[in-house]
């Protein structure tokens, strides 16, 4: 979920382990040559999740930490690939903390259904995050 701390925690862990770090959102933006939010505005959720899946399926996990986008969990194909090739860690963060961390939802690139609120998006993904996780780490700190 956006605002969970995936990039911050992933980057810190990669430095600690002397691994490479990949920010999935940055890889996606490099592929589409625009911001995620612009792409979502132009092409919508379905087109974006297809691109996201392609990017995730191309990752080589040899001594690499990957911070996926929060919507990666919407693709069974991508998540099964991640579980087969890596350890999946779910950063568990309360909705209250997420909503405090995300200031401008309309510019953040959060993949949502039409008219879907942040809370509805959070609730839609919560069980999926738990289902695919090999490990759960609470991350409600600042």
What are these regions (language model features)?
Residues 1:
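P-loop (Walker A) phosphate-binding loop of NTP-binding proteins
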Residues 8, 12, 16, 87, ...:
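NTP-dependent small-molecule kinase module
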Residues 23-72, 76-80, 123:
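ATP-dependent small-molecule kinase phosphotransfer cores
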Residues 5:
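Conserved glycine(s) of the Walker
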Residues 69-73, 94-96, 142:
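Short glycine-rich anion-binding loops that position phosphate/pyrophosphate groups of nucleotides
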Residues 84-127:
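A glycine- and Lys/Arg-enriched "phosphate-lid" helix/loop adjacent to the NTP-binding pocket
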């Amino acid at each position: 979920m956006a605002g969970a701390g995936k990039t911050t925690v992933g980057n810190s862990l990669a430095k600690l382990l002397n691994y490479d770090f990949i920010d999935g959102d940055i890889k996606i933006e490099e592929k589409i040559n625009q911001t995620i939010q612009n792409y979502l505005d132009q092409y919508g959720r379905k087109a974006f999740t297809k691109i996201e899946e392609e990017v995730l399926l191309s990752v080589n996990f040899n001594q690499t930490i990957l911070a996926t986008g929060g919507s990666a969990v919407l693709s069974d194909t991508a998540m099964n690939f991640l579980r087969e090739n890596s350890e999946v860690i779910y950063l568990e963060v309360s909705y209250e903390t997420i909503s405090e961390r995300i200031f401008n939802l309309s510019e953040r690139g959060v993949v949502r259904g039409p008219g879907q609120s942040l809370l509805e998006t959070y609730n839609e993904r919560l069980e999926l995050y738990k289902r695919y996780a090999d490990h759960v780490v609470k991350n409600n700190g600042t």
